[in-house]
């Protein structure tokens, strides 16, 4: 059966920012079928550089897939912008599933 993904977004940790890096992660869990697309936007503009997607094997219990999409930036790049958005397109929804956060509210 088709399963709609659960999407969550996580800002970089304070520890990571202290060391000069910034990784934003979008978790997309328990979806089926496997065909899925994740798009990153920074302040509304699509960001393709520094993105790494990793899909897990099918879950043995419910046959769904999960994936993480990681956006890697430097701390300087990260602090230059405010709105970070992860958009997930899957056949279970006619419109993208969108999760975002404002850096100045973290």
Swiss-Prot record:
<dbReference type="GO" id="GO:0030183">
    <property type="term" value="P:B cell differentiation"/>
</dbReference>
<protein>
    <recommendedName>
        <fullName>Ig kappa chain C region, A allele</fullName>
    </recommendedName>
</protein>
<dbReference type="InterPro" id="IPR003006">
    <property type="entry name" value="Ig/MHC_CS"/>
</dbReference>
<keyword id="KW-1015">Disulfide bond</keyword>
<dbReference type="InterPro" id="IPR007110">
    <property type="entry name" value="Ig-like_dom"/>
</dbReference>
<dbReference type="GO" id="GO:0002250">
    <property type="term" value="P:adaptive immune response"/>
</dbReference>
<dbReference type="GO" id="GO:0071735">
    <property type="term" value="C:IgG immunoglobulin complex"/>
</dbReference>
<dbReference type="GO" id="GO:0042105">
    <property type="term" value="C:alpha-beta T cell receptor complex"/>
</dbReference>
<dbReference type="InterPro" id="IPR050380">
    <property type="entry name" value="Immune_Resp_Modulators"/>
</dbReference>
<feature type="domain" description="Ig-like">
    <location>
        <begin position="5"/>
        <end position="102"/>
    </location>
</feature>
<keyword id="KW-0393">Immunoglobulin domain</keyword>
<feature type="disulfide bond">
    <location>
        <begin position="26"/>
        <end position="86"/>
    </location>
</feature>
<dbReference type="InterPro" id="IPR003597">
    <property type="entry name" value="Ig_C1-set"/>
</dbReference>
<dbReference type="InterPro" id="IPR036179">
    <property type="entry name" value="Ig-like_dom_sf"/>
</dbReference>
<dbReference type="Pfam" id="PF07654">
    <property type="entry name" value="C1-set"/>
</dbReference>
<dbReference type="InterPro" id="IPR013783">
    <property type="entry name" value="Ig-like_fold"/>
</dbReference>
């Amino acid at each position: 059966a088709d399963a709609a993904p659960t999407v969550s977004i996580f800002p970089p940790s304070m520890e990571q920012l202290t060391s000069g890096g910034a990784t934003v992660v979008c978790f997309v869990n328990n979806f089926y079928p496997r065909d899925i697309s994740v798009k990153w936007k920074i302040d509304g503009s699509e960001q393709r550089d520094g993105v790494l997607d990793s899909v897990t094997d099918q879950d043995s219990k419910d046959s769904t897939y999960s994936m993480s999409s990681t956006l890697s930036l430097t701390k300087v790049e990260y602090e230059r912008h405010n709105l970070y958005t992860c958009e997930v397109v899957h056949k279970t929804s006619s419109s993208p599933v969108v999760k975002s956060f404002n850096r100045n509210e973290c």
